[in-house]
A protein has these predicted regions:
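Sec-dependent bacterial lipoprotein signal peptides
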Residues: 1-26
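N-terminal "domain-start" segment that seeds a small globular fold
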Residues: 21-43
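Short active-site neighborhood of thiol/selenol oxidoreductases, capturing the structured segment around
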Residues: 42-63
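Conserved helix-turn-beta segment immediately C-terminal to the redox Cys motif
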Residues: 48-50, 64-86, 98-99, 150, ...
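Short alpha-helical
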Residues: 60, 87-91, 143-146
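Thiol-based oxidoreductase modules, predominantly thioredoxin-like and allied folds used
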Residues: 78-90, 102-111
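Short, internal strand/loop/helix patches
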Residues: 98-131
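Thiol-/selenol-based redox modules, centered on thioredoxin-like
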Residues: 125-160
Length: 160
């Protein structure tokens, strides 16, 4: 018999932490549905920072910030997706994009998706993920140009 220092409870806790870490590493990426009805995961946007924006067509601040999000996505430094907060269909996403001139990919979150961020309690809410998919910032409220500029600076100079 080999004696190991530390209590049995402590070793058991360490083993459970290891198992939990392994299980979370094996959790599939959350799935979304795009306007074409295709399945999309956040892994599709890996390799560059990603701004995930929750919006709704009835939310005036959400619609006011869309031109800023369109411009940010066009610049290409940060990928941008917008998730409709309300249940909807791919056809309705297409209508929204046309009606409000939304150029960023519009997605529907599957209800059972395990997201790397909480479902927002208010709109608009945006989540900035780094190039590895880790949550870096949560931004609640309408994004104006000054917030967009700060986001870009935080990506260029992490830790500042």
């Amino acid at each position: 018999m080999v004696r190991v220092s530390g209590s049995g409870k402590e070793l058991k806790r360490i083993c459970w932490l290891i198992v939990a870490g392994l299980l979370s590493a094996c959790t599939p990426a959350p799935e979304f549905t795009d306007a074409a009805g295709q399945t999309v995961t956040l892994d599709h946007f890996a390799g560059k920072p990603l701004l995930v924006n929750y919006f709704a067509p009835w939310c005036a601040p959400c619609l006011r910030e869309m031109p800023h999000l369109n411009a940010l996505a066009t610049e290409g430094e940060i990928a941008v997706v917008a998730i409709n907060y309300d249940p909807t269909t791919p056809a309705e996403l297409d209508k929204l994009a046309a009606q409000y001139h939304i150029k960023v990919p519009l997605l529907i979150a599957n209800e059972d998706a395990r997201l790397p961020f909480p479902r927002p309690s208010g709109l608009p809410t945006s989540y900035l993920l780094d190039s590895e998919g880790k949550l870096k910032q949560t931004l609640v409220g309408e994004l104006g140009q000054s917030q967009i500029d700060a986001l870009k600076a935080s990506i260029r100079h992490p830790g500042n």
